[in-house]
Amino acid sequence: MSDATKQKAIRKLETMSVKIGYPDEWPESMDMMQVTPISEGGSLLSNMLVNMQVSIEDSLQKLGDEVDRSLWGMTPQTINAYYDPANNEIVFPAAILQSPFYNPDAEDAVNIGAIGFVIAHEISHAFDANGSKYDEYGNYNEWWTQEETQKYNELSQSIVDYYSK
């Protein structure tokens, strides 16, 4: 990477936001979600279809609105984490903050190794083939030079080739 691109990468890392645990507020669309029990004629499919419709209608109503950066892409009960390039943020739902990823009774080294790996993994997505196409504000902006992108793609392909044997 050129020095100029490295500086942009550092700026992107420094401006990255972090969400941990759960959102401060639930989206209003969550209040419209519903589950009809099987005993009342509901089914997994019918419940999924009704709630997908609610989600689609909610998304359509937001078209043209300013991006709500407070929204989460996962529920707190989800044992996962993610990097969102459009918001330049990493998100750690509450459920991942338990063993084996985090244990308040464990040695610091154990937690650093476990949850630290997850954190580093998510940060790395800010600079992978997809994340590198978004700037520190979450705008689609290819800030790597063509040569840097080509070199990255070549190195990535060499790893794919090596592990595909």
Task: Please tell me what each predicted stretch does.
Residues 1-165:
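Intrinsically disordered, low-complexity linker/terminal regions across diverse proteins
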